Amino acid sequence: MSKPFVVVSCPIDTYSGYGSRARDVVRALMRSDKYDVKILSQRWGNTPYGFLNENNPEEKKMKDAIIPPQLQRQPDVWIQISVPDEFQKLGKFNIGITAGIETDLCDVRFIQGANRMDLILGSSNHSLYALKNSVYEQKDKAGKAVGHIKLETPTDILFEGVDLEKYFPIEPKDLPKTELVQSLDTIEEDFSFLYVGHWLRGAIGEDRKNTGLLVKTFLETFKNKKKAPALIMKTMTGPASIMDRNEVLKKIDAIRKSVQGRLPNIYLIHGDIEDSDVNHLYNHPKVKAMINLTKGEGFGRPLLEFTRSKKPIIASNWSGHLDFLNKEFASLVPGEVKPVHESVVQDRLILKESKWFAPDASFASLLMKDYVNSYKGYETKGKRLAHYCKENFSFEKMQEKLEAIMDKNAPKKVEIKLPNIKKISLPKKDD
């Protein structure tokens, strides 16, 4: 019996969050060996292309599965990994996979796109919130209200599982002496907070990742301290380049100039690095905790991956990462849900009417101080969080969930069994 024909349209070969998500979904489908999987490779904004490595057997298999844009036959299952307004219905059964939008409202085109599909899979509860929360008035050509546009398609959660083979705890003595590890060794501070994320558009305290506010809060918290910790930032504003690196340094310097006093050190890691280097960074003994004062996450993948180091996390108490950052073990910063700033409004993505989270910077400051002064207790919580996430949010658990969803919804191939026909002998005609 032939396998169901599954086509996945996704940014499989890009250096992007959606690219990582796409590779995970395709890897899970291929490992299940239940489907004939083909891929329509897409670009993702201005992110770099060419991630797939032919020397990696699984990635070579993905590359070999890429087909031309013109489909020769209708897929049994069409899966599109993208933002909802790009969703198309091309298969017998159609699944849209999305991280949604980080605010509380989405554009009407997102809802219309989602309603073209048979099933929507969100990365987290928050990733589906805006789709479910947004309702638009539908009008006829004369402008008369005739109904409402709202989400009609069934939904489910397919979280982004951490790859336990790529991210795992390493004892300091076992860290390889790579260029990155040796650079981290030279940091004079023994205690460093780590931030991982893009520095996105917006005024200080208004960009989605809240990178500017984090820098300012860190500097204000530890200025003039005799023994201050460091802040290590793995960040970019766009594609890796010397110009972008200079732009990030310029932003940091501008914030430093706004804070008076003797200031703590900030170290920048810029550009794309291998997963193995990221794991070494997470496990380096000078990195004590991850911090992220984000205004909103569809999921928050680096936060989950960092849990494998068994170190504690400080993060905003809102949006996608709350699915896996158990409040018993993570340090969650309170705040308010407030309207987005005009400096971050983007057509179809971040609406001027929408809201997202404003974490309490003074509370974050107190937490950072307490981490430095009373680290042992937080270290214990980090270990418990690591166990919780390993048991509940691994790649294998994600694959199990995806297979269950596919088994339930994918059209089944019907095997036609012919009845056994008894062979008979006809009597010979007499001559």
Predicted regions and their residues:
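Conserved catalytic-core segment of nucleotide-activated headgroup transferases in glycan assembly
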Residues: 21-23, 27-28, 164-277
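Donor nucleotide-sugar binding/catalytic pocket of nucleotide-sugar-dependent glycosyltransferases
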Residues: 119-179
